[in-house]
Every structure is written in C-alpha cells, then in structure tokens.
C-alpha cells in the first residue's frame, strides 16, 4: 500500500512539473532564418508560429517561388530549434532521459 501511495505522489509531482514545463515552453521563443535574414520566423518551443518577417525586396510577383522556398526553409529552421529547446527542457523533467524524436508535449 505504501508503494502505491508513493507512486501516486510521484505521479502528482510529475503532473505538476509537466504543467510548469508547458508554461516554460510557451515562453521560450526561437527564430528560424533563411536567405541570409531575408525571411525570419519566430516560433515558441511549443511549435506555435508567433511572427513572420519578410524583407520587402522579396515581394516581387515574378519571384513568388523564391519567397515560398525561403519561407519553408525558415519554418523548418525554426521548427528544428523549437524541437531542440523542447528536448532540452524535457531532459530536466525526465532526469536526463531524452524524449523520442517527434514526441511532443
């Protein structure tokens, strides 16, 4: 019975830490950059896009494909950085065990 109560207490502590972690991940922001800074994407560590900045020189109707490629690249860069930030925060919660790739909170 004492083991069960201990497990329940640990589960409650883990749940509390997870809520705290969610809040921290929401506050962490990363920036994805492409085209030497022509396109920037700001994203939370929870993978929520917060802002997109596009240099006006890319707003040429004849170059839409270039803008699309740079935007995809900046989003991918931001996503990689957000995933790394999430992994780093999860290591503190799990005592150094890393989260399997693609497993988010």
Swiss-Prot record:
Pfam families: YbaB_DNA_bd. InterPro entries: YbaB-like_sf (IPR036894), YbaB/EbfC (IPR004401). Keywords: Cytoplasm, DNA-binding. GO terms for molecular function: DNA binding. GO terms for cellular component: bacterial nucleoid; cytosol. Its main location: cytoplasm. SUPFAM superfamilies: YbaB-like. It is found in: Cytoplasm, Nucleoid. Homodimer. Belongs to the YbaB/EbfC family. Binds to DNA and alters its conformation. May be involved in regulation of gene expression, nucleoid organization and DNA protection. This is Nucleoid-associated protein RPE_4812. It comes from Rhodopseudomonas palustris (strain BisA53).
């Amino acid at each position: 019975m004492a083991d069960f109560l201990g497990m329940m207490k640990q589960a409650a502590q883990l749940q509390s830490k997870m809520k705290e972690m969610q809040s921290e991940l929401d506050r962490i922001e990363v920036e994805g950059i492409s085209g030497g800074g022509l396109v920037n994407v700001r994203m939370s560590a929870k993978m929520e896009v917060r802002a997109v900045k596009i240099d006006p020189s890319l707003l040429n109707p004849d170059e839409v494909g270039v803008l699309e490629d740079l935007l995809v690249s900046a989003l991918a860069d931001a996503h990689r950085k957000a995933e790394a930030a999430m992994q780093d925060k999860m290591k503190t919660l799990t005592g150094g065990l890393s989260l399997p790739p693609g497993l988010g909170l």
